[in-house]
From Swiss-Prot:
GO molecular function terms attached to this record: ubiquitin binding; ubiquitin-protein transferase activator activity
Biased composition (Basic and acidic residues): 180-191
Cellular component annotations (GO), alphabetically ordered: Hrd1p ubiquitin ligase complex; mitochondrion
Compartments where located: Mitochondrion
Span of chain positions assigned to the transit peptide in the UniProt entry: 1-29
InterPro entries, per the entry: CUE
Lineage, broadest ranks: Eukaryota, Fungi, Dikarya, Ascomycota, Taphrinomycotina
Biased composition (Low complexity): 122-140, 153-165
Region Disordered, residue ranges: 109-191
Organism, scientific name: Schizosaccharomyces pombe (strain 972 / ATCC 24843) (Fission yeast)
Keywords: Mitochondrion, Transit peptide, Ubl conjugation pathway
Protein name in UniProt: CUE domain-containing protein 4, mitochondrial
Pfam families, sorted: CUE
Keyword Mitochondrion: yes
GO biological process, one term: ERAD pathway
């Protein structure tokens, strides 16, 4: 065989080997990615903003962060998640294989029993009809203590609430968080105060409605 033919065969063989290796690598990578997605389902989970979880947690400190994150995945809205929490029912925990537990671990008191039984904290009563008023009363006391903690008593008047709502809309209309740490902390503080006041107003309306139903 002539040198030219040998060189041509070597080039063809090299190209063939490289092509086969590339095809094998692509197929293998696709299989790994597909199996990872199908086995865990983690890649299909909607993203959750940890800052939103923190905001809800400040209003309802007894709720599990993973349960808050799981509800935010479904509602995609902080106010909607707060409404769900105000109903007096415990927010459900995510599935066992959820990636949310890596970011928001269960508290030490929750344990594995929270998964199987989805138990309610001792201060939440949700088992019968009378539990609605009990849960509302407890939540109202909790909001009252939060208002005292953050010195928000002076902002409970109707005029202050209206101005607070206006400020709340201005804050939420910001599409991006401030760049400096100080501005972010101030923004979170305002959001926290506005959420506590809004939650208190909703809870007062709920308690008033329950009293009217009893009468």
């Amino acid at each position: 065989m002539q040198p030219e033919q040998l060189a041509g065969c070597a080039v063809v063989l090299t190209v063939t080997v490289l092509t086969l290796r590339w095809m094998f690598r692509v197929d293998k990578g696709g299989e790994v990615s597909e199996s990872r997605t199908s086995s865990s389902g983690v890649d299909n989970e909607p993203p959750v903003n940890s800052e939103h979880v923190h905001l809800v947690k400040t209003v309802f400190p007894h709720l599990e962060s993973s349960a808050i994150a799981y509800d935010l995945q479904k509602t995609k809205n902080v106010d909607a998640t707060i409404e769900n929490a105000l109903r007096g029912q415990p927010l459900p925990l995510p599935p066992r294989n959820s990636s949310l537990y890596a970011r928001f671990p269960l508290s030490a008191g929750a344990g594995a029993s929270s998964h199987s039984e989805e138990t309610t904290p001792s201060h939440e009563v949700t088992s019968n009809v009378s539990s609605g008023s009990s849960a509302s009363s407890l939540a109202s006391n909790e909001h009252r203590s939060l208002i005292e903690t953050y010195n928000l008593s002076s902002r409970i008047s109707s005029s202050d609430n209206s101005s607070s709502s206006t400020g709340n809309e201005e804050v939420r209309n910001r599409s991006k968080l401030p760049s400096s740490k100080k501005e972010r902390e101030e923004l979170f503080r305002k959001r926290k105060e506005e959420m506590i006041l809004a939650a208190r107003k909703r809870m007062e309306g709920k308690i008033k409605g329950e009293k009217q139903d009893k009468n």
